[in-house]
Design a protein with these regions (language model features):
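A generic structural signal for well-ordered coil/turn residues at beta-strand boundaries
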Residues: 60, 125, 200, 237-239, ...
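N-terminal Rossmann-like NAD(P) cofactor-binding subdomain of oxidoreductases
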Residues: 1-197, 299, 323, 331-332
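C-terminal active-site/capping subdomain that shapes the small-molecule cofactor and substrate pocket
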Residues: 228, 240, 244-332
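Acidic, glycine-rich segments within the central catalytic cores of soluble metabolic enzymes
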Residues: 165-236
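Short clusters of hydrophobic/aromatic residues that line enzyme substrate/ligand-binding pockets
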Residues: 64, 129-131, 145, 187, ...
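Conserved active-site and cofactor/substrate-binding residues in soluble primary-metabolism enzymes
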Residues: 7, 11, 38, 87, ...
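Short, solvent-exposed beta-strand edge segments and adjacent coil->beta transition regions
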Residues: 142-143, 199-201, 238-242, 304-306
Length: 332
C-alpha cells in the first residue's frame, strides 16, 4: 500500500483521485487545497466531463468521505506546514501548478513525505519521467522530486521514440491541437499571454508549449531537434499532437504504421494505443492512454513524415500519474 497526499485538488488532482480508485495499491491519506470542503466534495462528485462519481461523497470542516473512507483535508498555503509525517505519506502529488520548482516542491519532503511527483514540467527536478519511455532511468536512491512532464510530452514522446528508434529523427516540428484549460479565460480578460487573454470558448488560440523542447529530458538524443507550439481550441478536453519530422532514412506509410502498432502491442502497451478507426476528439475522452496513434493520418513524402496522436489531456495524464506513483511506491 502506497500512502499518497494530494496538494491541489483541481482538474488534475480530482482526475487523479478518480483514477486512483481502481488501483488498490494507492491509499489517499490527505488532501490540501484552499477551496472550501463543500466545494471540493461537490466538484469531486459531479464532473462536467467524467460525469457523476457514483459513490457517496460527504464532507465535514476537516475531511471528505468517499464511499465510507474518510480523508483529512487541509488548507495550508505553505507545503512545509502539512502533516505528511503524521499521516505517513509516502508520496505527495504536487498538482497545484504553483510549486513546480524543486526548492518549493521539496517542502513536502521537509514535511515528512518520501517522494514528490509534480504534475507539470518542473525546474531543477531530480528527473522527468514519461512512463513507457524513460521510467527505467528512475533511481530511488537519488530521485526524490520527480516531474511527470506535461500531458503533451506524454503523447509526443512515445511516437517520437518509435520513429527515432526505427529510422532516426533529424529534426521536426510539432503542433498540439489542445483543449482549453483553466489558464485561459471565458471572456476577453487581461493575461500576460495576449493570445490567452482572448475568450477560450469562441477562438482558436495559438500559444506556447514546452513539450517539444522538454522531449530532450526523456529522450536526450533528440535535444535541439524538435520545436513547436500549441493551438488551443474550444473544447474542454481531448487533444491531438501533430508531429512532422525529417527522418534519417526513408520510410513508407505502411512501415511507420506497422512500427507504431508493434510498439502499442509490445514495449509501449498501456501507454501507446493504435487505431485504424476514423475517430474524432470526442471518441478519446476518458481514454487512459498517453497517446492514441491515428494510423489513417500518417503521411509520407520521402523521408518527411507527418503523424498524429490523440490524447485526453486530463484523464490520460492522470492515469500516468497513477502509474508513476505506483512505480515509485514499489521502491520505497
Amino acid at each position: 500500500m502506497i500512502n499518497v497526499g494530494i496538494n491541489g485538488f483541481g482538474r488534475i488532482g480530482r482526475n487523479f483521485f478518480r483514477a486512483s480508485l481502481t488501483n488498490p495499491e494507492i491509499n489517499i491519506v490527505g488532501i490540501n487545497d484552499l477551496t472550501p470542503n463543500e466545494t471540493l466534495a461537490h466538484l469531486l462528485k459531479y464532473d462536467s466531463i467524467l460525469g457523476r462519481l457514483g459513490l457517496e461523497v460527504t464532507f465535514t470542516d476537516d475531511s471528505i468521505t468517499v464511499d465510507g473512507k474518510t480523508i483529512k483535508v487541509f488548507s495550508e498555503r505553505d507545503p512545509a506546514n502539512l502533516p505528511w509525517a503524521l499521516l505517513k505519506a509516502d508520496v505527495v502529488l504536487e498538482s497545484t501548478g504553483h510549486f513546480t520548482k524543486a526548492a518549493d516542491a521539496g517542502k513536502h519532503i521537509s514535511a515528512g513525505a518520501k517522494k514528490v511527483i509534480i504534475s507539470a514540467p518542473a525546474s531543477d527536478e531530480d528527473i522527468t519521467i514519461v512512463m513507457g519511455v524513460n521510467h527505467e532511468k528512475y533511481d530511488p536512491a537519488n530521485h526524490h522530486i520527480i516531474s511527470n512532464a506535461s500531458c503533451t510530452t506524454n503523447c509526443l514522446a512515445p511516437m517520437a521514440k518509435v520513429l527515432n528508434d526505427n529510422w532516426g529523427i533529424v529534426k521536426g516540428l510539432m503542433t498540439t491541437i489542445h483543449a482549453y484549460t483553466n489558464d485561459q479565460v471565458i471572456l476577453d480578460f487581461p493575461h500576460k499571454d495576449l493570445r490567452r487573454a482572448r475568450a477560450a470558448a469562441i477562438n482558436m488560440i495559438p500559444t506556447s508549449t514546452g513539450a517539444a523542447k522538454a522531449i530532450a529530458l526523456v529522450l536526450p538524443e533528440l535535444k535541439g531537434k524538435l520545436d513547436g507550439y500549441a493551438m488551443r481550441v474550444p473544447i474542454p478536453t481531448g487533444s491531438a499532437t501533430d508531429l512532422t519530422v525529417e527522418l534519417a532514412k526513408e520510410a513508407t506509410v505502411a512501415e511507420i504504421n506497422a512500427a507504431m502498432k508493434a510498439a502499442a502491442n509490445g514495449a509501449l502497451k498501456g501507454y501507446l494505443t493504435y487505431t485504424e478507426d476514423p475517430i474524432v476528439s470526442s471518441d478519446i475522452v476518458t481514454d487512459p492512454s498517453s497517446c492514441i496513434f491515428d494510423s489513417g493520418l500518417t503521411k509520407v513524402i520521402g523521408n518527411q513524415v507527418k503523424i498524429v496522436g490523440w490524447y485526453d489531456n486530463e484523464w490520460g495524464y492522470s492515469n500516468r500519474l497513477v502509474d508513476l506513483i505506483s512505480y515509485v511506491g514499489k521502491t520505497l
